[in-house]
Curated annotation (Swiss-Prot):
This is Transcription antitermination protein NusB. The keyword RNA-binding applies. SUPFAM superfamilies: NusB-like (SSF48013). The keyword Transcription regulation applies. It comes from Clostridium botulinum (strain Hall / ATCC 3502 / NCTC 13319 / Type A). GO terms for cellular component: cytosol.
Length: 143
């Protein structure tokens, strides 16, 4: 199983729930239906994530952990934004920041630099170079 792909699925579920107000529990129930969304990628023929490579238990733990600690996670993000409000962040960037902030704060077995690097890679893939730099700066203040 692949942690990188698992993070990607978790980020996409977070994005989905942030975008359409769907309950995280519903999103987890529909995990088998996860498909690449044109709304979060610039490439229309982008490959979908193969769920056989995904650690579903890890994804569920991350999603549930973020849901249970969302206020604390968002406060941590807000405290590290400079000249930005959390409401102005793109939904993709917010999803990535929530995912990484959760890992930094609650997943002690994952080195901070790994979580930050994975967040930067997700930002490059789904949001762009400027977002990757922005996310790196925000997360760099947290560690």
């Amino acid at each position: 199983m692949n942690r990188r792909k698992s993070r990607e699925v978790a980020m996409r579920l977070l994005f989905q729930t942030t975008l359409n107000g769907e309950n995280l529990e519903e999103a987890l129930e529909n995990l088998k239906d996860v498909r690449e969304s044109e709304e979060i990628t610039k490439e229309k023929d982008y490959e979908s994530v193969d769920l056989k490579d995904v650690d579903i238990d890890y994804v569920k733990r991350i999603i549930k952990g973020i849901e249970e600690n969302k206020e604390e996670i968002d406060e941590k993000i807000k405290g590290n934004l400079k000249n930005w409000k959390i409401e102005r962040l793109s939904k993709v960037d917010l999803s990535i920041l929530r995912l990484c902030t959760y890992e930094l704060k609650f997943e002690e077995d994952i080195p901070n630099r790994v979580s930050v690097n994975e967040a930067i890679e997700l930002a490059k893939k789904y949001s762009g170079e400027k977002s990757a730099t922005f996310i790196n700066g925000v997360l760099g203040k947290m560690i």
